[in-house]
Design a protein with these regions (language model features):
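Generic beta-sheet signal
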Residues: 1, 73-75, 266-268, 301-304
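Non-catalytic, usually N-terminal nucleic-acid engagement modules in DNA/RNA processing proteins
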Residues: 1-2, 6, 13
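A short beta-strand-to-loop transition that corresponds to the Sensor-1 phosphate-sensing loop
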Residues: 4-8, 79-82, 98, 305-309
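Short, active-site-adjacent cap segments at secondary-structure transitions
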Residues: 9-13, 57, 83-86, 276-277, ...
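Glycine-rich loop at the start of a catalytic domain that most often binds anionic cofactors/ligands
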Residues: 14-19
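Extended two-metal-dependent nuclease catalytic cores across DNA- and RNA-processing enzymes
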Residues: 22-202
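Active-site-proximal helix-loop-helix substrate-binding element of RNase H-like nuclease domains
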Residues: 48, 101-129, 249-252, 273-314
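Long, highly charged low-complexity segments
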Residues: 207-302
């Protein structure tokens, strides 16, 4: 098992196209701050994390998938990025995390499932992006050619090489022909940007990715983070961990909140069955559940929540 991460540095794609991923919102700091914790957990749990300067996580996945195929192994890629569908093959399956009707689901793609869904082969997914671009990555594509037109063109002609070699012969509206001709350079640039690199300079020895036994520090690490449900799922006994005392057990005087005005901006909330505590402006306040209910329903106040499902049922 390999867990691939992006680095917060430019990649070879930025060198080819300076506007690559331009305008994308920065990753929220509350998420960024959790990456070191996640990586430490993965390390202690026996998994190998992989990062590569100048390359993206997709390139790492593509390189490892090809290496697995070449060594007569099968590969499963778990991702939320549709770009990885170009890596699907008889030996590589993609498990795509998606949301349907507000509920999460995992869709498994092999070549047959991919063709059933999109009517395209894995290599044709790259050609599709060459024409329609990708707004999320700021890949330009051909101006004026959307997903519907691009899908029709690739379904009939399979790749942009054929399209441009036969630009005067292909069966399209003249307006589409003009757009294709005008956007040729961007089409080829977009194909290059959208193609996952399968030769990133990383360790491809499959034996180095065998899951190792849990480190003895894993149990106390998880207990400190109060990952008790996950520990139970993993068969890790909480008794084996020296659990740090909860904040409520620390000798600390909690001041009762008297007025709503004491809570300003973003807050952190801790709740048990009978009471709650709020951290605001580096001060901890104790309050009753009726007050906390009003606080949590206040859309103006930003909250950070763990185990939201349990809280929402109360």
């Amino acid at each position: 098992v390999a867990v691939a991460f992006d680095l917060n540095t430019p990649t070879f794609r930025h060198k080819k196209y300076v506007q690559y991923k331009a305008g994308r919102h920065k990753t929220p700091m509350e998420l960024v701050s959790q990456f070191p914790i996640l990586k430490e957990w993965l390390k202690l749990a026996g998994y190998k994390c992989v990062e590569c300067e100048g390359y993206e996580a997709d390139d790492i996945l593509g390189t490892l998938a090809l290496s697995a195929e070449n060594s007569e192994n099968t590969c499963v890629i778990a991702t939320g990025d549709r770009d990885s569908l170009q890596l699907v093959s008889d030996k590589t399956r993609v498990l795509l995390a998606a949301t349907k009707m507000g509920k999460p689901e995992i869709i498994s793609y092999d070549p047959a499932a991919l063709f059933e869904k999109y009517g395209l082969t894995p290599p044709e997914m790259i050609e599709l992006k060459a024409l329609m671009g990708d707004a999320s990555d700021h890949i330009p594509g051909v101006a004026g050619v959307g997903e519907k037109t691009a899908t029709d063109l690739i379904t009939r002609y399979h790749d942009i090489d054929y399209i441009y070699k036969n630009i005067d012969k292909i069966d399209v509206k003249e307006s589409v022909r003009a757009k294709l001709a005008a956007g040729k350079d961007f089409a080829y640039l977009s194909r290059e940007l959208g193609t996952i690199c399968r030769y990133a300079p990383i360790d491809t020895d499959m034996s180095d990715y065998v899951i190792r036994p849990h480190d003895s520090r894993l149990a106390p690490f998880m207990a400190q983070l109060e990952f008790f449900k996950l520990m139970e799922k993993m068969g890790i006994s909480a008794d084996s961990a020296a659990v740090a005392p909860k904040a409520a057990a620390v000798n600390r005087k909690l001041t009762v909140i008297q007025e709503n005005s004491l809570v300003d901006g973003r807050i952190t909330v801790w709740i048990d069955d009978n009471s709650a505590a709020v951290v605001s402006n580096n001060k901890c306040f104790k309050c009753d559940l009726e007050y906390i209910k009003a606080l949590l329903t206040d859309k103006v106040v930003e909250k950070y929540v763990y185990d939201y499902k349990s809280i929402s049922k109360r």
